[in-house]
Amino acid sequence: MSLTQRYTAHLGYAPPKFRPQFLESVGTTTPTDHIEYAAALGMAGIFDPWALGRDRRELDEIGRALTDTGLSCGSLVCVPLDKVTAPIWTDRTASGRHSLEQLIRAAAETGQALGSPALAVLVAADPDRTDIAQQRADVAANLREMGRVTADFGIGLAVEPMIALPNMLLRNITEAVAVVSAADVPGVGIIFDTGHVSTTDGDLLAALRATGEHLSLLQIVDMPGRVEPGAGELQLVDLLAAALDSGYAGLIDLEHYWADASRDGERAGLDRIRRFDALVDAAVRPQSATPSPQH
């Protein structure tokens, strides 16, 4: 059964195990096997946020598999895992800016090779500073400069607000919008993750409206538990339909665990995704004039 929207299946996003989304169904952790499986399911792409941690041989194999299957690549986290909670985005010293640019150029080269649309930016605060407003101004300045760097590679930057990691400086949509607006450079936007936003902002539709033109990437998970759409309590059909109606045409990352991580649970979860997709399709069709049920 084909899917109507541009979903991605992930190759592993949660440390320390980085379990691929369909591990039980595929039976291996080999990225190319998962890319072929995602294509067979009718997915539009794959999501490999920690691709920077892979070696060149594996990245080349992933690139060839994407070309062979016609799948797209989602966003990559812009720095290696060990630097995600370091205050690199608040550092405006000459050495700090030079180090940041080196990291971003390396990530952009990898993203360009895989066809990724954007680098995900997680912004940590500097624990040795108390000037939160100035730190956010420094982040905006660095985003402005690095956005111009990634533009040379045809790639954007996308800030992902959250509190799931320690010491985050940009924790919700309001804070992310303020910094991205201050950066004021094309190609720098916001990742809207329904799991994070439901925790930090509450009202998904209000947060989506607040994100507005800054929406770069959409990640769909249900809550509680970061499970597949339809396995939780969030009004995800309305959310995705609203994003599509507003003109969003990018990939939709399914960055979730399963309600049941067994092989049968993956199959049941995939059925939930297909039902969710059908409801979204009905909600965005012009002839559909009545609200759709959520689950």
Question: Where do the model's predicted regions map?
Answer:
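N-terminal pre-domain/capping segments
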Residues: M1-Q112, L270, R274-H295
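Hydrophobic faces of well-ordered beta-strands that scaffold small-molecule active sites
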Residues: Q5-Y13, I46-D48, C73-C78, L119-V121, ...
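Active-site beta-loop-alpha junctions enriched in small/polar residues
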Residues: H10-P16, P49-A51, C78-D82, A124-D126, ...
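Gly/Pro-rich active-site loop or hairpin
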Residues: R19-T28, A86, T90-R97, L170, ...
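Active-site acidic/histidine proton-transfer and metal-coordination neighborhood
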Residues: E24-T30, D68, W89-G189, T199, ...
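Generic structural signal for well-ordered alpha-helices
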Residues: P31-I35, L59-G63, I104-A108, A140-G147, ...
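A structural motif
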Residues: A40-M43, A113-S116, L215, Y248-A249
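Glycine-enriched alpha-helix->loop->beta-strand junction motifs that scaffold or abut catalytic
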Residues: G42, D184-G189, A210-S216
